[in-house]
């Protein structure tokens, strides 16, 4: 077949040539050829740390027995990782590479090797963390500055820069927001219409994002529910940002500037000196106020910094944090199972983000199925709450869009994708999320699907454009033309859409839909199949 296509290609022009090329490309994935396997590397040094984490969860999982929830297969694990770390499921091209792994290779670490080398991972993780750092506020200047910051974050994540270094540079950044994008952590808080950065906004974000402490309400009064936090804790933290000033040369330190605030019950404001809200023995003088704060936050003995980072990373991988809310963790505990083991391992690794992801993905909770093997004994709420089964959670809006877009293209839409395809994907994702509804900063709050969301998947522009008969742009039509058999067609469609093979009942049902149909009728049948699977519950959930 390949030899025939190669000899015929020079004789054709125009659309015929394009279709032949697409057929040649698809044949690689439909006929299950020998595909270059993923690079595999040994990560035996992780075994001890993963064992500590697994032991902690085993102690907490007393009932029901763990044997009722088996280990997930390689395709399920790859789908979880791709959705969590790139915002889209694996392509059929990538799945064939996964299936070509040598026997005995660990699919999780092999897949992570693949994802960490893909710029999609860095860009997507940067966007997820940017929500905690600077929120999702809009406006022409804010959007551009935020985008510059996200790009910078992606550059740091791509080289696996130690997370503590990254955060120190964010908090203490100086310079123009164009040439020093990290300074946009400060500039996005600049009050509209002039003025310097908003110290209170920076204090609130810093406390939540880097300490896992909710001090927002303490801006106006002491904590009404405990004696732990006082109004002074908030304003003394805000005072660290008072000397950050914005000028024509960008963010600079204005050492003579003081911070003033009015405490509850007082008639006038007062000057407030900076002071950390806990663990003052870790604080060291020297440098600007923001440099001092950054060193204290990332001090190895300030475990709060590691805890909130671990909690957010866990939530990105599972769709649900260990401790809820994700950015409000009690300083003195008690802590949820696994959090302390992961936090101390993160610190010991030198705040290695890729290693943290490998440890979490290598743990028993991540590698388990989300369903019981016994249909008469389904997974219980207790099993999910103790992580004895993988929690089933709805996909985020951009993950739903990414799934539709990737499923319609059998090749991976990765960092090497042509700029035209990238721009199309960006525009389609932006429009879909706008209509589907962005979760905003509170991205891990439990939400149920809405009727408008279901209607958007049923009748929306993205699904229609990506499933309708189109031999150049859509995989549904290309499968209808080039797959050598109905069985191969169904295998490819299910792998592209759901990252699994069809069950026997599914195969029987959809074979009847396809058998005997040719050309236009087969194109329409494949479009219907794609539409049906996109509108299935399984498509829009992480399992």
Description of each model-found segment:
Residues 1-18:
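N-terminal Sec-pathway targeting helices
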Residues 16, 23-270, 274, 305-343, ...:
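Short, structured secondary-structure elements
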Residues 271-285:
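Internal "kinase-insert"/substrate-recognition segments embedded within catalytic cores
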Residues 279-282, 291-294, 454, 473:
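Hydrophobic helix-coil surface modules that form long, contiguous segments used
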Residues 283-287, 292-305, 309, 313-317:
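Structured secondary-structure scaffolds
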Residues 346-349:
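Localized edge beta-strand/strand-to-loop motifs within extracellular or lumenal beta-rich domains
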Residues 499:
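Conserved micro-motifs of the catalytic ATP-binding
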């Amino acid at each position: 077949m390949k030899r025939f296509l190669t000899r015929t290609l020079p004789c054709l022009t125009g659309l015929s040539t394009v279709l032949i090329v697409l057929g040649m490309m698809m044949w690689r994935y439909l006929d299950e050829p020998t595909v270059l396997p993923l690079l595999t590397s040994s990560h035996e040094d992780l075994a001890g740390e993963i064992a500590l984490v697994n032991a902690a969860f085993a102690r907490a999982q007393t009932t029901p027995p763990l044997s009722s929830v088996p280990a997930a297969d390689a395709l399920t694990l790859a789908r979880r990782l791709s959705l969590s770390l790139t915002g889209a499921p694996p392509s059929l091209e990538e799945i064939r590479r996964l299936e070509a792994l040598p026997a005995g290779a660990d699919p999780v670490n092999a897949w992570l090797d693949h994802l960490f080398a893909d710029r999609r991972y860095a860009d997507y993780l940067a966007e997820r963390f940017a929500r905690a750092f600077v929120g999702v506020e809009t406006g022409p200047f804010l959007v551009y500055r935020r985008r510059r910051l996200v790009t910078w974050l992606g550059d740091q994540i791509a080289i696996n820069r130690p997370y503590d270094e990254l955060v120190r540079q964010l908090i203490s950044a100086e310079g123009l927001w164009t040439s020093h994008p990290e300074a946009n952590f400060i500039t996005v808080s600049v009050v509209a219409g002039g003025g310097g950065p908003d110290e209170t906004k920076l204090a609130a974000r810093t406390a939540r994002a880097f300490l896992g402490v909710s001090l927002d309400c303490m801006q106006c009064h002491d904590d009404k529910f405990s004696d732990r936090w006082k109004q002074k804790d908030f304003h003394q933290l805000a005072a660290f940002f008072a000397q950050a000033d914005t000028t024509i040369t960008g963010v600079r330190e204005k050492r003579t500037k003081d911070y003033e605030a009015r405490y509850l019950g007082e008639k006038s404001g007062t000057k407030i000196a900076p002071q950390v809200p806990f663990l003052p023995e870790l604080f060291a003088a020297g440098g600007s106020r923001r440099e001092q704060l950054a060193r204290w936050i990332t001090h190895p003995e300030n475990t709060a910094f590691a805890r909130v980072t671990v909690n957010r990373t866990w939530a990105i991988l599972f769709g649900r944090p260990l401790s809820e809310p994700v950015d409000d963790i009690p300083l003195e505990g008690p802590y949820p199972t696994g959090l302390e083991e992961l936090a101390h391992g993160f610190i010991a690794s030198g705040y290695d983000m890729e290693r943290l992801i490998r440890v979490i993905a290598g743990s028993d909770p991540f590698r388990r199925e989300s369903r019981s093997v016994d249909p008469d004994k389904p997974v219980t709420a207790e099993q999910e709450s103790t992580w004895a089964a993988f929690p089933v959670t709805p996909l985020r809006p951009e993950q739903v869009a990414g799934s539709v877009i990737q499923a319609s293209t059998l090749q991976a839409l990765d960092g090497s994708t042509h700029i035209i395809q990238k721009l199309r994907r960006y525009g389609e994702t932006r429009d879909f999320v706008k209509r589907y509804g962005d979760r905003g900063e509170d991205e891990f709050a439990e939400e149920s699907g809405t009727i408008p969301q279901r209607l958007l998947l049923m009748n929306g522009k993205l699904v229609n454009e990506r499933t309708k008969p189109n031999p150049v742009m859509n995989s549904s039509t290309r499968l209808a033309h080039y797959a050598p058999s109905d069985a191969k067609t169904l295998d490819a469609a299910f792998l592209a859409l759901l990252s699994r093979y069809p069950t026997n009942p599914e195969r029987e049902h959809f074979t009847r839909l396809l058998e005997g149909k040719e050309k236009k009728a087969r194109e329409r049948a494949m479009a219907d199949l794609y539409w049906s699977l996109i509108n299935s519950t399984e498509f829009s959930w992480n399992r």
